[in-house]
Amino acid sequence: STLANKIVDCIKNDSNPEGKFLHPVSKFNQHLCFTGGEPLMITGQQAVVGIYNELKRQDNLPGSMTFETNGTQKLKPEFIEWANSIDTEIFFSCSPKLFTVSGEKPEKAIKPEIVAEYAKVSSKGQLKFVVGEKDREWNEMEEAVAKFRDAGVDWPVWIMPTGAREEEQTAGAGKVAEKAFKRGYNVAARVHVYLFGNAIGT
């Protein structure tokens, strides 16, 4: 209940003094995103269920929930049972790390069988890859996409240009976007960087 109350406190402001997900001004039922770190570690899965149950007890549920994950964490049976029992939409945003970009070894980072489990829990999701202009990065990304497709994951693919700072993104983002569109992928920008800079808490 402490974590749920902290989340409610975070969305309190002058126009939403009680911290309601159903915003009193826009009348829009807002979204709750679990990010990290890695929110689908075993302790994270347990915490999410507790947070949801407490928000439900307070009659203050979000319109939908997203899990921002690297797609390597197996779902516990208890989490799957809970996810299948609730009416709130669950969305998985999976961002597998590429060796050519992050140095993460493929056998650790690319887990199609695990992401396929997520897709069975919810048809709502996406695969998101951080990619630059280099051909080897694109080749690795498309090899990974093929593995996810073979496992039955048919979520859309989003490409996020490399670069944590706005000037880094601006330098190559156009070329990355052009490549993505030609290959039938979507492009994701780091909007928070444009708005607030690469600062903690944004």
Each predicted region: which residue ranges?
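Conserved alpha-helical substructure of the radical SAM core
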Residues: 1-33
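Conserved AdoMet/S-adenosylmethionine-binding subsite of the radical SAM
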Residues: 22, 27, 40-202
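Active-site beta-strand/loop signature of hydrolases that rely on acidic residues for catalysis
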Residues: 36-37
